[in-house]
């Protein structure tokens, strides 16, 4: 059984909890998620089953879409609503919609972000939240992220909050973004609510819940919930090959580029009759060759 489960992660579960449940439901240890969501966050969490686990890093690398609420007036140690309040300031002059939109525009593009102390980012083999809980200070790594879209969706002036929609690269901490937006507006702030509505090609409307999975398991139809692996690689270039080339690709052979053949965008996918065969990329030392990164065994023509 191979494929991608477009899970809607509920609040209260860690991403690892979701993986463990899916291992039980699908009776396999080959299960992996494609981007951590905090326990208090709900949203799209594609789960890779069987051979689909080979594409986890490629699916993790896709754009993410979030909806978040920025709460002005106080900040917390965790940068979300679960942490202890560390700074407060009366919101005496709530920003106008125009001011909010102007500030949001300044965050669009490539930028650098320092991850929050209460996060799973590792420094010297230890997670940042472990340092935070032990009250130890450590230099946090600066990471490059990209905000593709950042829009204002609604305003609640009475409660000093507003909602935003974010399209961003992997590794973006929305909590930190909310704090930085607050600073730009002149107020301490935190993220009071977050939902991930899309990861790569998987959106909220296509997801399944644990209740749906349990019902499918009881009917022995859980495999129907899985999307084919190719659906998780829609962001990569796909090249259709013939039967002879299929055999060479499935054997994991390095391939020569034909004369005058344009180079593909790295990485790219070889497919045959709708099935993903392998993911290839340019050879690091031979510009006239391409090499396999992942090869998929075609057992039942459902990958």
From Swiss-Prot:
<keyword id="KW-0413">Isomerase</keyword>
<comment type="similarity">
    <text>Belongs to the pseudouridine synthase TruB family. Type 1 subfamily.</text>
</comment>
<dbReference type="InterPro" id="IPR032819">
    <property type="entry name" value="TruB_C"/>
</dbReference>
<dbReference type="Pfam" id="PF01509">
    <property type="entry name" value="TruB_N"/>
</dbReference>
<dbReference type="GO" id="GO:0003723">
    <property type="term" value="F:RNA binding"/>
</dbReference>
<dbReference type="InterPro" id="IPR020103">
    <property type="entry name" value="PsdUridine_synth_cat_dom_sf"/>
</dbReference>
<feature type="active site" description="Nucleophile">
    <location>
        <position position="38"/>
    </location>
</feature>
<keyword id="KW-0819">tRNA processing</keyword>
<dbReference type="InterPro" id="IPR014780">
    <property type="entry name" value="tRNA_psdUridine_synth_TruB"/>
</dbReference>
<protein>
    <recommendedName>
        <fullName>tRNA pseudouridine synthase B</fullName>
        <ecNumber>5.4.99.25</ecNumber>
    </recommendedName>
</protein>
<dbReference type="GO" id="GO:1990481">
    <property type="term" value="P:mRNA pseudouridine synthesis"/>
</dbReference>
<comment type="function">
    <text>Responsible for synthesis of pseudouridine from uracil-55 in the psi GC loop of transfer RNAs.</text>
</comment>
<dbReference type="Pfam" id="PF16198">
    <property type="entry name" value="TruB_C_2"/>
</dbReference>
<dbReference type="GO" id="GO:0160148">
    <property type="term" value="F:tRNA pseudouridine(55) synthase activity"/>
</dbReference>
<dbReference type="GO" id="GO:0031119">
    <property type="term" value="P:tRNA pseudouridine synthesis"/>
</dbReference>
<dbReference type="InterPro" id="IPR002501">
    <property type="entry name" value="PsdUridine_synth_N"/>
</dbReference>
């Amino acid at each position: 059984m191979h494929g991608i489960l477009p899970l809607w992660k509920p609040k209260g579960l860690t991403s690892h909890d979701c993986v463990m449940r899916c291992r039980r439901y699908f009776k396999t240890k080959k299960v992996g998620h494609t981007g951590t969501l905090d326990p208090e966050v709900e949203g799209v969490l594609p789960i890779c089953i069987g051979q689909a686990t080979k594409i986890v890093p490629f699916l993790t690398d896709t754009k993410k879409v979030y909806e978040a609420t920025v709460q002005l007036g106080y900040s917390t140690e965790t940068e979300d609503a679960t942490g202890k309040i560390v700074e407060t300031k009366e919101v005496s002059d709530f920003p106008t919609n125009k001011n909010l939109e102007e500030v949001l525009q300044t965050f669009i593009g490539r930028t650098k972000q320092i991850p929050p102390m209460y996060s799973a980012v590792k420094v010297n083999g230890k997670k940042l939240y472990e340092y935070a809980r032990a009250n130890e200070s450590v230099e946090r790594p600066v990471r490059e992220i990209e905000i593709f879209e950042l829009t204002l969706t609604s305003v609640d002036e009475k409660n000093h909050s507003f909602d935003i929609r974010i399209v961003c690269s992997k590794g973006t901490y929305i909590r930190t973004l909310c704090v930085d937006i607050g600073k730009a507006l002149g107020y301490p702030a935190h993220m009071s609510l977050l939902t991930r509505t899309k990861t790569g090609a998987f959106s909220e409307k296509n997801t399944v819940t644990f209740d749906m999975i349990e019902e499918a398991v009881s009917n022995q139809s859980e495999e129907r919930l899985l999307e084919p692996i190719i659906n998780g690689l829609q962001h990569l270039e796909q090249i259709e090959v013939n039967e002879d080339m299929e055999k060479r690709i499935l054997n994991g052979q390095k391939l020569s580029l034909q004369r005058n053949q344009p180079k593909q965008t790295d990485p790219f996918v070889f497919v045959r009759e709708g099935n993903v065969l392998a993911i290839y990329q340019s050879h690091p030392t031979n510009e006239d060759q391409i090499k396999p990164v992942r090869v998929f065994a075609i057992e039942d023509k459902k990958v």
